[in-house]
């Protein structure tokens, strides 16, 4: 079966340009139809899927998640404790001090990020409130002007001049005598 670039892009979850780039990286022979569109076979699709999945797995393995939780910190502490048993007490104290400073820094950074997020939300809420108050003022002004205006009388619909029926022209009396 033949597939076009947009279909494969949708399957892989990438852009059509990325599909062409992946095909070039895999050295696939890409055929074009009479309109200049790339045509891929089922084998090409399978190869690209395998390649794309392997790339995703690679990127996930090389880039661990940035979230740190208390469980992760505790796990690191236990790992450090096992290593420390083999190291002298002086080195152990240095490592624990470094670990404590790092955890404090992480906690501070998390608090700062949370504070910034809260500040952004607060600013957005205040902005929305201001906009709503401005809209309310405009509505009140419009209501006041409508109340001041005299009542509007609705006139019956009349057709515009260009749509009115034309009255037949009266023939001149002389023409009617001669039958013209």
From Swiss-Prot:
Annotated DNA-binding residue span(s): 5-25
GO cellular component entries: cytoplasm
Superkingdom of the source species: Bacteria
Subcellular location: Cytoplasm
Record carries keyword Metal-binding: no
Record's keyword terms, sorted: Cell cycle, Cell division, Chromosome partition, Coiled coil, Cytoplasm, DNA-binding, Sporulation
InterPro entries xref list: Chrosome_anchoring_RacA (IPR023522)
Any one Gene Ontology molecular-function term assigned to this protein's record: double-stranded DNA binding
Transmembrane helix among keywords: no
Any one of the GO BP annotations: chromosome condensation
Coiled-coil region(s): 89-151
Role this protein plays: Required for the formation of axial filaments and for anchoring the origin regions at the cell poles in sporulating cells, thus ensuring proper chromosome segregation in the prespore. Binds in a dispersed manner throughout the chromosome but preferentially to sites clustered in the origin portion of the chromosome, causing condensation of the chromosome and its remodeling into an elongated, anchored structure.
Family under the similarity heading: Belongs to the RacA family.
Protein name stated in the entry: Chromosome-anchoring protein RacA
Source organism of this protein record: Bacillus cereus (strain AH187)
């Amino acid at each position: 079966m033949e597939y076009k670039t947009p279909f494969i892009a949708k399957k892989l979850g990438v852009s059509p340009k990325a599909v062409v780039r992946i095909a070039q990286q895999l050295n696939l022979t890409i055929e074009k139809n009479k309109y200049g569109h790339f045509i891929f076979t089922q084998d090409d699709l399978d190869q690209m899927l395998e390649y794309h999945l392997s790339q995703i797995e690679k990127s996930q393995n090389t880039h661990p998640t940035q979230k740190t939780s208390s469980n992760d910190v505790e796990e690191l502490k236990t790992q450090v404790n096992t290593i420390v048993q083999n190291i002298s007490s002086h080195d152990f104290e240095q490592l624990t001090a470094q670990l404590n400073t790092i955890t404090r820094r992480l906690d501070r950074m998390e608090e700062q990020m949370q504070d910034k997020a809260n500040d952004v939300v607060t600013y957005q809420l205040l902005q929305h409130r201001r906009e709503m108050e401005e809209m309310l003022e405009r509505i009140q002004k419009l209501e006041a002007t409508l109340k001041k205006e005299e009542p509007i009388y609705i006139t019956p619909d009349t057709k515009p001049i260009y749509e009115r029926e034309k009255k037949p022209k009266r023939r001149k009396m002389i023409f009617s005598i001669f039958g013209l």
